[in-house]
Amino acid sequence: MFTKTDIEKYFMAEKSESLLFVIIGVAAILVAAVFFFFLKTHFYKGMALPLLLIACIQLTVGYSVYKRSDDDRKRNTYAYDLNPSDLKNKEIPRMEKVNSNFVIYRWIEIVLLLAGLVLIFLYRDNTERSFLFGIGIGLAIQAAIMLGADYFAEARAKVYTKGLKDFTAKT
């Protein structure tokens, strides 16, 4: 049975994961800065590039989700008791869009992971191409992190969406 507690848990988990995204993004930026400004080899400069670029995405997405999670939680727990039609007419369509976006994100992340792995295997023994080897490692690391995080977020979103649908079908 879907309850207000399920809504609370979903948004608290969403907020926690988004904070983790922010922390990972900040850490990746710091690591990229060390690689670029202190280690300075082609390999580390190459690795810094995808770390930095994907960290910007992690910070942006993480912060925006973190910022809105409490309002979403309050709005939907309120709607659960006083206006269940809002869950049906607003929250379910929003979550269906979120779930369809996860499919897109997953394929992008898989492509980035594969691109990183291709660069790693093509240039692992080629010292003249250590920049590309570094890009491959940084890209593979960041894509794997994003893929893993989105896997859990997608699983949570599917359970939450199903709960919403079951609840609104009964009201």
Annotate each language-model stretch with its function.
Residues 121-171:
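C-terminal membrane-adjacent module
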Residues 20, 46-50, 104, 108, ...:
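Alpha-helical transmembrane segments of integral membrane proteins
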Residues 51-63, 137-147:
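Canonical hydrophobic alpha-helical transmembrane segment
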Residues 85-116:
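C-terminal halves and exits of single transmembrane alpha-helices
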Residues 65-89:
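Membrane-helix interface/capping segments
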Residues 62, 66, 101-104, 120:
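Amphipathic alpha-helical interaction surfaces
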Residues 1-34, 90-102, 149-171:
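Cytosolic-side membrane-entry/anchor segment at the start of a transmembrane helix
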Residues 10-59, 111, 115-126:
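Long, highly hydrophobic alpha-helical transmembrane signal-anchor segments
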